A protein has these predicted regions:
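FIC/Doc superfamily catalytic core
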Residues: 1-167
Length: 167
């Protein structure tokens, strides 16, 4: 999936695990020499999860936490999560711009404080938001997304006390 997702960026090594340690701010991700083993062990736990939503949340976290590629890790994490949901006939999860800070801080809560509650709540809300949003016609969708603040910058929305709303 990563190879297909990143095919237009051959310099990023589509489908190849990273060769150098990657960072996001102060966070240092899994050492390149441990990526494959970490993913294999993570996959063993994944196999024990019973629901598509649990597998989606876990897969999103696993890929985000390991950061196995030089680029495209967040995108592939969301692709992998949605593949779980689609395979089970469930609604996808989308993280609109206004909700990005919520998503990232929920990932941090799990990564740094071993607290899965925030990411489960954030992704559950995102999935319910997708289910409630009318996607059938472009103009109707655009209006609904604007009305529910989906396009707002997360920081501007936070400063104004504005949140993503269910349609």
């Amino acid at each position: 999936r990563h190879a297909r997702l990143m095919s237009a960026r051959p310099e990023k090594g589509p489908g190849q695990f990273k060769r150098e340690v990657n960072r996001a701010g102060q966070t240092v991700f899994v050492d390149p020499g441990h990526v494959e083993g970490t993913l294999r062990q993570g996959f063993e736990l994944y196999l024990s999860l019973e629901t598509a939503f649990a597998r989606a949340v876990y897969m999103m976290f696993l890929v985000s936490e390991v950061h196995p590629f030089a680029d495209g890790n967040g995108r592939i994490a969301r692709v992998m999560a949605n593949a779980e949901l689609v395979a089970a006939g469930e609604e996808r999860i989308l993280v609109p711009t206004v909700y990005r800070a919520n998503y990232l801080s929920a990932l941090k809560a799990l990564s740094q404080a071993q607290d899965p509650g925030p990411i489960v709540r954030v992704l559950d809300f995102a999935q319910r938001w997708v289910a409630a949003t009318p996607w059938m016609d472009l103009e109707g969708t655009r209006v609904a997304l604007e009305r529910n603040h989906a396009f707002m910058d997360a920081n501007e929305a936070e400063n104004a006390g504005i949140r993503l709303r269910l349609p």
